[in-house]
Amino acid sequence: SEVSEVIYPGLFQNPRDRKRNRKYLETGNGPMVGFELKGGKQAGQKFIDNLQMVYHVANVGDVRTLAIHPASTTHSQLSAVDQEKTGVTPGYVRLCIGLEHIDDILADLTQALEKT
């Protein structure tokens, strides 16, 4: 599957980002990154299923790299309309980058995307 959007404050996607980051994120942007997969909910679920090293869990406080597909897990009890209202789109995947070697993380994300 293809990534249609990346959500990360360090990308400075709009002019407010720099000002906000200087005010609230003085020491950096942190390990959280989100992205939207083309293909919606099915693509998000399949991507998670294809991960081999990255853990599929709902917490974000760990030294391991974690991934979650909110539309099919934490927000699955909400209707599609209510999910959209909370910012959860069908293909949205949230990652919390851990302490593994970056090459290992990228390899796992790449192979999962290729299989999705």
Predicted segments — roles?
Residues 1-63, 78-84:
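Conserved small-domain helix->loop->beta segment predominantly found in fold-type I
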Residues 49, 65-116:
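PLP-dependent enzyme catalytic core of the Aspartate aminotransferase-like
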